[in-house]
A protein has these predicted regions:
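N-terminal secretory signal peptides that target proteins for export/translocation
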Residues: 1-4
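Residue-level detector of intrinsically disordered/flexible regions characterized by low predicted structural confidence
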Residues: 6-9, 233
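Bacterial N-terminal signal peptides
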Residues: 8-17
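Boundary at the C-terminal end of the N-terminal hydrophobic targeting segment
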Residues: 19-24
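Extracellular/periplasmic carbohydrate-active domains that bind, remodel
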Residues: 25-496
Length: 496
């Protein structure tokens, strides 16, 4: 057995890492939010739940840097939910005029309201909500319940982090199978993760993984990076304060992300970036990211691509080759993203593209998701739901179904268009076909009209199905009305 601990870095190479040593508690590192008091009623009495701080950024205040910061709160707790759970939130700053508990589609309204508090019921742990007083979305409160985890893993392959603070630094996992990192309720793990060639890797629990002490400057890295990690599973944890992308997953098959929570404030704090992955299931997540919530990308390192992008000195003209060099497959296919709640303070909530490098994208389905916020509407990157047809890629069989978009502060509900954003050599996408929008409900007044735009006769979109796309309850029935623009390079459009 080999265990090396040096300079704040944990190397895990087919070894058993002993349970982490806890120092203090999570409150030492993630200070208490002083704006809110949260209590739950159980056992005949009110029990106070600790409220943590998290930073978020206001795109309207600083759209380029994204560093106009605010402090929101989040409360994590577990309950059996054998019966509905009553929650009381007190606004310590004083009185308020109105309160919203979102998603509004949950139908949660206060049972009791005083000048500075509200009480309401949660029917099950899937009802994770944002409590917003007087329309304040920057300094709001997330209530994040879960069921207790009764299946805590044990064994030589388990790295266990118990309640308290764990200064893990960089956790590197390589060339092994079956490793489990378990963050128990009350655990706060400080650091980031790099994993490569680690099959059947699981990261789960009810704790918090926080990267607040990692470099957020020029050398910032993703919070968790996975390369060639087949059958990866991430479940139950909350990821806070990523320096860059939150989850960067490259060249991995059979990925399952379930019930994760994310709060990120910095530019590029994408929630999940999938690069050359296939057979992916994302479900039951609750995400607030400054940048994209979920984005699906590709780069290229096929022998043909490498040969055509190698300079005379042996270097690559496309530096992204290094990210995906040595992968077995590059096709992007078989994605299902379902039952998630998405909040993007700047960018997209559900994005396919634009990075493609000539790779084929197919069989991608987003369904039964809720959008709480979206803002960007700059002519290049709009769309709570978007397909950016770029970078010599091909895109087919992409569906968005049963999506609720609440009263977002700006942006568009949907966009599919040709672009050369983030493309190598300025290439647009080749073509797109079979795009479906079904049961899309937007309620609000601030979103601008959606787009579906081909580029020319050759670079076109062929086969668009639109069924029950409504704006404030009114069906969208054509592509020339006030809510949807479809241009002449989009063919075979069907309104159901």
């Amino acid at each position: 057995m080999l265990l090396k601990i040096a300079q704040g870095v944990f190397w895990i190479l087919a070894v058993c890492l002993m349970p982490g040593t806890a120092h203090g508690n999570g409150r030492d590192v993630l200070p208490e939010n002083t704006a809110y008091k949260v209590e739950v009623f159980r056992g005949g009495t009110w029990e106070e739940i600790f409220v943590y701080n998290a930073r978020v950024s206001d795109y309207a205040g600083n759209p380029e840097a994204g560093y106009t910061q605010y402090t929101m709160g989040f409360a994590l707790f577990t309950d059996s939910f054998r019966q509905p759970l009553k929650v009381r939130v007190t606004r310590r700053a004083g009185t308020f005029s109105k309160v919203e508990i979102r998603p509004l589609s949950y139908g949660i309204v206060p049972d009791v309201q005083t000048p500075n508090s509200v009480e309401f019921e949660l029917g099950d742990p899937a009802q994770k909500v944002s409590v917003e007083f007087d329309g304040n979305r920057m300094e709001n409160l997330f209530i994040l319940p879960d069921l207790p985890d009764t299946a805590i893993p044990m064994g030589a392959n388990v790295t266990y982090f118990g309640p308290g603070v764990h200064n893990a630094g960089v956790i590197r996992i390589a060339n092994e199978s079956g490793r489990i990192l378990y963050l128990d309720e009350g655990a706060v793990v400080l650091g980031r993760i790099e994993a490569e060639n680690a099959a059947n890797l699981t990261i789960r629990g009810r704790g918090v993984f926080c990267s607040s002490q990692e470099d957020h400057g020029a050398g910032r890295r993703p919070q968790m990076e996975f390369r060639n990690c087949d059958n990866l599973k991430i479940e139950g944890i909350l990821l806070r304060d990523t320096p860059n992308w939150t989850l960067k997953i490259v060249g991995s098959t059979g990925v399952h992300i379930d019930n994760s929570k994310e709060i990120g404030w910095i530019m590029n704090s994408d929630g999940m970036d999938f690069i050359c992955c296939r057979d992916v299931l994302v479900e039951n997540t609750f995400q607030r990211n400054y940048d994209d919530n979920v984005t699906i990308k590709a780069f290229n390192a096929t022998p043909e691509y490498i040969a055509s992008h190698t300079n005379t000195d042996g270097s690559y003209s496309d530096g992204a080759i290094w990210m995906v060099a040595g992968l077995r497959d590059f096709e992007v296919c078989n994605y299902e993203i379902r039952n998630c709640v998405f909040w993007a303070d700047k960018a997209h909530n559900m994005l396919v593209g634009p990075e493609a490098r000539g790779i084929a994208f197919r069989n991608i389905r987003f369904h039964d998701n809720i959008v709480l916020e979206n803002r960007q509407d700059d002519g290049i990157y709009p769309g709570a739901m978007a397909v950016m047809i770029a970078d010599d890629g091909t895109f087919e069989d992409i569906a968005f179904e049963n999506i609720i978009v609440e009263d977002i502060d700006g942006g568009k509900v949907f966009c599919a268009h040709f672009t050369n954003a983030w493309a190598f050599d300025g290439l647009y996408g080749q073509w797109a076909r079979n795009i479906t929008l079904r049961n899309i409900a937007y309620t609000g007044t601030r979103a601008t009209p959606s787009w579906i735009r081909g580029r020319n006769d050759a670079q076109s979109i062929d086969g668009v199905t639109i069924g029950n796309f409504t704006v404030n309850g009114t069906p969208v029935t054509d592509g020339s009305g006030p809510h949807l623009e479809i241009n002449e390079y989009v063919r075979n459009v069907t309104f159901e």
